[in-house]
Design a protein with these regions (language model features):
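A short, well-ordered alpha-helix in the C-terminal region of glycosyltransferases
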Residues: 346-361
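A short helix/loop element that forms part of the nucleotide-sugar donor recognition site in Leloir-type
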Residues: 176-189
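N-terminal strand-loop element at the rim of the active site
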Residues: 9-17, 33-79
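Nucleotide-activated donor-binding/catalytic signature segment of Leloir-type glycosyltransferases, i.e.
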Residues: 119, 240-265
Length: 380
């Protein structure tokens, strides 16, 4: 049986995250619920402390690097005397890990390799949330993924790997007790208007411009719809993503006053926004490994219209728990699919079935239970 766990992740977001960060959210939600004593090792960003005691069996240890240190050792000389991977192992050592302890690396094959090189005998698990090429991973690696789609992806590269499915989850209390639902009037939308809703990254892989173009088509034939887009459309990104966000802003400006760009919201706030939606559209252009927005929307009792690319169709079943977008996706096809979904006589029943599906399969408590079963079975 596993006696202690170190959860860690690539040094981008601090934990708990203050913006949309599905990987770090999974770590924080499961770590605080599991009965296995654990420490989370992550980067320390501005505004965070070095340490957070979550409860009596979970704590967060944030690894900070000064600007001078990063400039001197990580940028100029690239001779880092105390790299992130070693600092994680130092946290593990301070935790008095034993031969029955496990290090779980989230979504960074590079970090997994670095830790494995420094601790070749450590018990380790690779937890992948996205589809990458697993260069340099052990052929018999133990891996957790959120969907059958992602399991098949990695099995094709690593046929001898031991791969288990542990899905993502949602906090049902956030909907049922803690949410303060927004009203359409809060955004200047009249109650009779049908609100199309999108939440996620404003990036090409999420298909935001396609949705905006589809909405433009819809406005030509109906005057009872509005579009709400939640996501950071003014990020500090450069290059292709910056150009894409500029295109999104220009399209949204053209669609005013019927299109509202809300901007980014925190993971805690997003639960208040789904109340605005009559239909949540997820037109992902890439192979979506799972999609947190889909289960969040379904958990809020909202109908979803999703891309069939990737893992979403494992729980969004056409005509049962949601609706599927036609392929190939075009502005015209998405507009048609939105019209069909909104006109469906089974819309409310489908929404209820989607909500029940999420309540039965994806509460964080059930995700944590499944996680414990997997790791304890691997390391008996």
């Amino acid at each position: 049986m596993v006696d202690k766990i170190i959860f860690t992740v690539t040094p981008i977001f601090s934990i708990p995250p203050r913006s949309a960060a599905a990987v770090e959210t999974w770590m924080y939600q499961v770590a605080q619920r599991t009965s296995i004593p654990n420490r989370i090792a992550c980067i320390k960003n501005e505004g965070y402390s070095d340490f957070l005691m979550v409860n009596d069996h979970c704590s967060v240890h944030r690894i900070g690097f000064s600007r001078l240190y990063k400039r001197l050792f990580q940028k100029w000389t690239r001779l880092d005397p105390l790299p992130y991977s070693q600092r994680i192992l130092n946290i593990a050592k301070d935790f008095n890990v034993t031969d029955d302890s496990v290090i779980i690396v989230h979504n960074s094959i590079k970090l997994y390799r670095q830790i494995r090189k420094r601790a070749p005998k450590a018990k380790m698990v690779m937890h992948m949330h996205n589809a990458f090429e697993p260069d340099g991973l052990d052929q018999n690696v133990k891996m957790i993924v959120p969907s059958m789609f992602l399991k098949k992806h990695y099995q094709a590269y690593l046929p001898n790997a031991d791969i288990a499915i542990v899905p993502n989850g949602i906090d049902l209390e956030a909907y049922q007790k803690n949410a303060v639902p927004l009203q359409k009037s809060d955004l200047g939308i009249t109650p009779e208007k049908k609100t199309i809703f999108f939440a996620g990254r404003i990036s090409p892989d999420k298909g935001v411009t396609l949705l905006l173009q589809a909405f433009e088509q819809l406005l030509k034939v109906r005057n009872d719809i509005e579009l709400v887009v939640v996501g950071n459309y003014m990020s500090k990104s450069k290059g292709e993503k910056a150009a894409y966000q500029r295109e999104v802003r220009e399209l949204a400006e053209r669609l005013k006053p019927h299109c509202r760009m809300v901007g980014g919201v925190t993971p805690e706030e997003i639960y208040n926004y789904y109340s605005l939606a009559d239909l949540v559209v997820i037109p992902s252009q890439f192979q979506e490994p799972f999609c947190m927005v889909a289960i969040e929307a379904m958990g809020a009792g909202k109908p979803v219209l999703v891309s069939t690319r990737g893992g979403m169709t494992e729980f969004v079943k056409e005509g049962d728990t949601g609706f599927h977008l036609q392929e190939p996706m075009t502005p015209e096809s998405i507009a048609s699919d939105i019209n069909k979904a909104l006109a469906s006589p089974d819309l409310n029943d489908i929404s209820l079935r989607g909500q029940r599906c999420v309540e039965e399969k994806f509460p964080w408590e059930k995700v944590t239970q499944r996680f414990e079963e997997v790791v304890n079975n691997w390391f008996k």
